[in-house]
A protein has these predicted regions:
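N-terminal intrinsically disordered, cationic/polar leader segments
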Residues: 1-72, 76-108
């Protein structure tokens, strides 16, 4: 029996999308049929109050891209992200997480 031919995905991207968009926040939710990934940009946190008057910190976020994928795609997505994260850290060192509570990157 002949081996299965290799499958190669040839990705194309429009000139409008080649630059990409910046995102520093990811929201994920799902239905029985798909996962939705909302990539967003956060703004500086602001003190505020909830409906009962309790103090809250509000972080305005603007969604810059929404991606919907079927659940079956998530396995390959997670595998690919993990492989790339390992490669990144092998090349550049471990990624340092910001301290808990930091919701907006400090000025550099």
């Amino acid at each position: 029996m002949a081996p299965e031919p290799q499958v190669r995905f040839e990705m194309a991207i429009s000139e409008n999308d080649v630059v990409g968009v910046y995102s520093n926040f990811l929201g994920v939710w799902h239905t029985p049929h798909e996962f939705t990934l909302d990539f967003a940009v956060t703004q500086p946190a602001m003190p505020g109050a909830d409906e009962e008057g309790n103090a809250v910190t509000r972080v305005p976020c603007q969604v810059v891209a929404r991606v919907r994928v079927p659940p079956t795609v998530l396995f390959d997505f997670l595998r690919t992200i993990n492989e790339n994260l390992s490669n990144y850290e092998a090349n550049f060192g471990a990624i340092q997480r910001p301290p808990a509570g930091d919701v907006y990157p400090p000025d550099e």
